């Protein structure tokens, strides 16, 4: 199933719409199946869908893995807009390092009591994007705001 993305809708607004559907569905599944089974079912399905969607976008993007990663990243940034606060640490040909110190996405999912769902819908996408750039782009991240960290530490290494 192809997913159409409306570039005029901010990513935060899209995520809020998704949450309005997914959170009640997840709660209903928990009531029927139990929390552990429902969480596993939903996170597995969303994780696979998101992974496949990003890899499909990468396959349709021309260029080397690094060029694909750069193109998809550049295309996504306008939709993210000012909904994250970035502290740039290093920007060089072989590395990009920054911290996200504020995240309206994490605020949104904490407000509805579902930060793990937010991590699957958003944070894991960064790993999928890095996979598009592999083996030329490598992401290391040890913490995210969504999972309780003080900031999200993005450390990209670029290889030739």
Q: What residue spans do the PLM features occupy?
A:
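A helicase ATPase "motif cassette" and its flanking acidic/Ser/Thr-rich regulatory loops
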Residues: 98
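Ligand-binding pocket scaffold of soluble enzyme catalytic domains
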Residues: 127-128
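Short loop/turn segments at strand-loop or loop-helix junctions that form parts
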Residues: 101
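N-terminal accessory segment detector
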Residues: 1-95, 104-122, 136-151, 158-160
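A contiguous catalytic/ligand-binding core that recognizes phosphate-bearing ligands
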Residues: 131
């Amino acid at each position: 199933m192809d997913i159409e993305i409306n570039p005029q809708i901010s990513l935060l607004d899209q995520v809020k719409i998704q949450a309005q559907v997914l959170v009640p569905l997840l709660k209903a599944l928990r009531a029927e199946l139990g929390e552990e089974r429902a969480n596993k079912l939903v996170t597995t399905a969303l994780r696979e869908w998101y992974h496949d969607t990003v890899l499909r976008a990468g396959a349709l993007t021309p260029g080397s893995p690094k060029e694909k990663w750069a193109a998809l990243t550049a295309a996504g940034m306008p939709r993210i807009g000012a909904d994250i606060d970035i502290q740039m640490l290093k920007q060089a040909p072989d590395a990009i390092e920054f911290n996200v110190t504020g995240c309206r996405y994490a605020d949104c999912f904490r407000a509805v009591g579902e930060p793990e769902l937010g991590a699957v819908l958003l944070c894991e996408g960064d790993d999928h994007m890095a996979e598009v750039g592999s083996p030329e782009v490598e992401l290391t991240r040890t913490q995210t705001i969504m999972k309780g960290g003080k900031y999200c530490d993005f450390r990209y290494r670029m290889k030739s």
